[in-house]
Amino acid sequence: MKKVIFIFIMCFSFGSLIAQDVAALKNAGNDALKVKDFAKALENYEKVMAATGTAGPDYAMIYNSAVCAIQIKNYEKAAKYFDQTIAGNYKPEDSFFNKAMVLKLQKKNEEYIKVMNEGITKFPENPKFKTDLAKYYLMDGSVQYNNGATLLKSAIDKLKSKKYKDTKDPAYLADIEKVKKEFSDAIPSLDKSIELNPADATAKTIKSNCEKQLKTL
């Protein structure tokens, strides 16, 4: 009986020490976060997670871990921790949006679009999902439009300098086909931007320019 009591006391004491250590690590993480030592904060938070496992996850701390990971540009960890806060329904709107931002930083564009569309569906009253996705499509369309404009200028310059014989020169015609492709490919992205943000005059103007150029080529 005494042996059982002794073992119980030892286990209780050991558990108390672990709890104290975990609390100390979490406090150290919070202190580091306050002074913007994000690497140190994340290190301490991860020690807490390693010690506690999956028992009663501290979603506030996990969310802070994701934020710290963004600050030190460890985007894989940031996405992982935002996945956990999404699963725990902790700050769901911010967790979804920030995960999408992390994916965009990683240039995982298809995954970014997927998460943003999920956010639009789940949180229709939150405008930032539509706003950011509209900007993404606007940028995508703008890049293709600018590529087309640059290629067109180059083709015209070569024509003026007699590098191309005339507008029937096969090399000139090949360049014009590339120009047409860039302008044509820009339009679907611009349409999506306009659909998400109908008031965006810039997207409408660029789309109109694409259409005008395609008619003249």
Describe every region a protein language model picked out.
Residues A23, P57-A60, D94, K128, ...:
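Start-of-helix register in tetratricopeptide repeats
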Residues V48, Q84-T85, E118-G119, S193:
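Canonical positions in the second alpha-helix
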Residues G53-G56, Y90, P124-E125, P198:
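Short coil turns that delineate tetratricopeptide repeat
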Residues A60-N64, N98, D132-K135, M139, ...:
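Canonical tetratricopeptide repeat
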Residues Y145-S189:
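Short coil/linker segments at helix-helix boundaries
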